[in-house]
Amino acid sequence: NLLTSPQSLYCDIKYIENISPVVDNDGKILFYCIFPFTPATGFEIFYCVLKPGCNHVSQTHKNGRTEYVMVADGEVEVAVGDNIYQLKRGASIAFDASAEHKYINNGIEDANMYFVLSYK
């Protein structure tokens, strides 16, 4: 009922500039953990900046079920097993998180991506 006082609803707003990134590949890749894994959700969400020239071999996620990647800006080459996919802004891919995979930025600008790693 709109006339009664509303109950407190859960809302958690995050800003990238307030999150310290995990830096890898000599500073060519930055991972920002936006929402860490919790058993209640069964997933975690990251924002990633892949610098030009970066070739990042990702760890396989033995406990992960599906990895979802959404390209926000730039272009990235995603290798999953023996398959290679060219993704650009607006493209998304989902794959078995336990598969060997890597991310390559052959472009001249940053590739910005969102990752969702599902464990359910």
Residue ranges: model-predicted function:
Residues G81-A97:
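Short acidic-glycine-tyrosine-enriched beta hairpin
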Residues G27-L30, T41, K88, A97-K120:
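Ligand-binding loop in jelly-roll beta-barrel domains
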Residues P21-C54, S58, V116-K120:
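A short glycine-rich, His/Asp/Glu-containing loop-to-beta-strand
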Residues V57-K62, I104-N106:
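Short histidine-centered beta-strand/loop micro-motifs
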Residues Y47-L50, H61-V78:
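Short, conserved beta-strand element in jelly-roll/cupin
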Residues N55-H56, E67, G74-A79, S92-I93, ...:
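Short beta-strand segments in beta-sandwich/barrel cores
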Residues N1-I13:
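Short C-terminal boundary/hinge segments that cap the last helix of small helical domains
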